[in-house]
């Protein structure tokens, strides 16, 4: 086979974020075959012409990512602080060019950091270790959730991972109503980016998405807890386990953290008073 045929082949699917390449199976190393692989590209968030952060992400729903990141990192207080947004190609990836209000941009410049993150790295941009786990306003206790509604949501979480279904390479974050219905979700190669996309989407949906909880397909790290709390999410469900720092942050900011979510199973780490199980 020619070398040119061994290179990455142009995407032939209709799903953004997937590309076909040639690969070899263990039981047949003589004959390459085509398979789908998830795309991962550098995405720079550029505020008022200044690059603030570079994250590795899936090249889809980037406006929601930029909005959610801006909210969960405290760069903005509400979507109204952003006057405009454009996604444009750059030499090695993509840029999300964000027009920020003067007041919020002045605050950003005071703590700006230039960095390049790993895939969805939640510590990226932290200048000092003391900045990790920064205080978050304690959440109110306005939400409740019936754990009997969780199983059906878990069965439908994969519906929001079309790239993941093809490649086995993405995380998902979805918004779950008190009824257990998943009304929207996003996926990404980075779990933090998937969550930021969801939080950005939620900020645009209004009252219909205010009641409910976040369900993620990944583990619950402290960054996932802190991002959720920064955006007013009171309940976070994770398919995998939580870390000790995630539990500490959740306890401190009054977030109900639930891990090991499988049909018929869930482990509640903090603030179980929001949950019922009839």
From Swiss-Prot:
Keywords: Cytoplasm, Molybdenum cofactor biosynthesis. Mo-bis(molybdopterin guanine dinucleotide) binds at residues 260-265. Pfam families: FdhD-NarQ. The active site is at 121 (cysteine persulfide intermediate). GO terms for cellular component: cytoplasm. One of its GO terms (molecular function) is sulfurtransferase activity. The keyword Ubl conjugation does not apply. InterPro entries: Cytidine_deaminase-like, FdhD. GO terms for biological process: Mo-molybdopterin cofactor biosynthetic process. It comes from the Bacteria. It is found in: Cytoplasm. PANTHER family: FORMATE DEHYDROGENASE, SULFUR CARRIER PROTEIN FDHD. Required for formate dehydrogenase (FDH) activity. Acts as a sulfur carrier protein that transfers sulfur from IscS to the molybdenum cofactor prior to its insertion into FDH. HAMAP family: FdhD (MF_00187). Belongs to the FdhD family. This is Sulfur carrier protein FdhD. It comes from Escherichia coli O127:H6 (strain E2348/69 / EPEC).
């Amino acid at each position: 086979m020619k070398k040119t045929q061994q290179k990455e082949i142009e995407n032939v699917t209709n799903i953004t974020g997937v590309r076909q390449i040639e690969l070899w199976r263990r039981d047949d190393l003589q004959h390459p075959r085509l398979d789908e692989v998830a795309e991962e590209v550098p995405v720079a968030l550029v505020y008022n012409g200044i690059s603030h952060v570079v994250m590795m992400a899936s090249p889809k729903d980037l406006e929601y990512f930029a909005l959610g990141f801006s909210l969960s990192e405290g760069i903005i207080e509400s979507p109204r602080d952003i006057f405009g947004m454009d996604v444009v190609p750059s030499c090695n990836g993509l840029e999300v060019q964000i027009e920020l209000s003067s007041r919020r941009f002045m605050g950003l410049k005071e703590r700006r950091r230039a960095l390049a993150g790993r895939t969805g790295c939640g510590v990226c941009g932290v200048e000092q270790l003391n900045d990790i786990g920064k205080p978050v306003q304690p959440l109110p206790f306005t939400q409740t959730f019936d754990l009997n509604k969780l199983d059906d949501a878990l069965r439908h979480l994969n519906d929001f991972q079309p790239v993941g279904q093809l490649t086995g390479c993405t995380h998902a974050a979805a918004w779950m109503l008190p009824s257990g219905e998943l009304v929207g979700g996003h996926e990404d190669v980075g779990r933090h980016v998937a969550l930021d996309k969801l939080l950005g989407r939620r900020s645009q949906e209004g009252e219909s998405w205010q009641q409910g909880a976040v369900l993620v397909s990944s583990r619950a790290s402290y960054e996932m807890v802190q991002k959720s709390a920064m955006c007013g999410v009171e309940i976070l469900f994770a398919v995998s386990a939580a870390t000790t720092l995630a539990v500490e942050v959740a306890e401190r900011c009054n977030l109900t953290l639930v891990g090991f979510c499988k049909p018929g199973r869930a482990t509640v780490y903090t603030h179980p008073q929001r949950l019922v199980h009839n």
